[in-house]
């Protein structure tokens, strides 16, 4: 939709919301990590880059989803504990935003239940009105996975997969948070070797 809008001369921020029923889905949220990577230890810059990028294709919670993930990855350069990173990122979200209320709810569910499955079932019920590709319920899944992963890469991937929803997008973002925070040694070789040290990208050249 955003590409079509741009081709028709509709530029950001209008390109993100005009004729766009997917404006608050996960398409921008899944791009957040790269903005955090290029702004190590500078969550404000990461947030600004993410906001600029997200408003091309999304609006409202769709934008804040990218900001949230960018902030978490940026914080990973200066904080090693995933649970602390999540809490810090939540505190940086606008207090009056719907997105903040969702990630705050997810955090409180984790605190209340003390176990990932109960916490996730609570969130899943609370946000069942949303499409499974919407940014908000997937943000809750990220919070639950990072909260209970105990800084363990295998456990993190298992938890985020068990939550369901848009699993590949969520896994990519939270795995990046942990990898930055804990370093490459946190990832077992069995996750890396099948790729044969090769990356396929859409980027030309």
What are these regions (language model features)?
Residues 26-28, 62-64:
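Hydrophobic, membrane-interfacing alpha helices
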Residues 2-23, 32-42, 51-56, 70-164:
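Accessory "access/gating" subregions that flank catalytic or transport cores
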Residues 26, 35, 174:
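Short glycine-rich loop/turn motifs that provide flexible caps or phosphate-binding loops at active sites
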Residues 45-53, 66-67, 195:
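Short, conserved phosphate-binding/catalytic loop or strand-edge motifs used
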Residues 58-61, 67-74, 144-205:
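Catalytic phosphate/nucleotide-handling subdomain of diverse soluble enzymes
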């Amino acid at each position: 939709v955003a590409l079509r809008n741009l081709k028709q001369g509709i530029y950001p921020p209008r390109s993100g919301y005009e004729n766009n029923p997917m404006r608050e889905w996960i398409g921008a949220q899944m791009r957040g990590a790269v903005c955090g990577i290029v702004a190590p230890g500078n969550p404000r810059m990461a947030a600004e880059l993410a906001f600029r990028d997200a408003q091309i294709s999304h609006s409202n919670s769709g934008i804040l989803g990218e900001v949230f993930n960018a902030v978490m990855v940026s914080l990973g350069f200066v904080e090693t504990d995933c649970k602390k990173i999540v809490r810090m990122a939540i505190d940086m979200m606008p207090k009056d935003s719907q997105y903040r209320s969702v990630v705050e709810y997810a955090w409180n569910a984790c605190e209340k239940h003390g176990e990932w499955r109960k916490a996730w079932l609570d969130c899943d019920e609370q946000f069942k009105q949303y499409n499974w590709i919407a940014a908000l319920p997937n943000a809750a899944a990220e919070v639950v996975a990072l909260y209970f992963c105990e800084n363990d890469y295998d456990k993190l991937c298992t938890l985020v997969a068990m939550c369901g929803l848009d699993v590949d997008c969520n896994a990519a973002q939270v795995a990046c948070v942990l990898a930055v925070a804990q370093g490459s040694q946190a990832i077992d070789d069995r996750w890396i070797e099948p790729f044969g040290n090769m990356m396929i990208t859409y980027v030309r050249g």
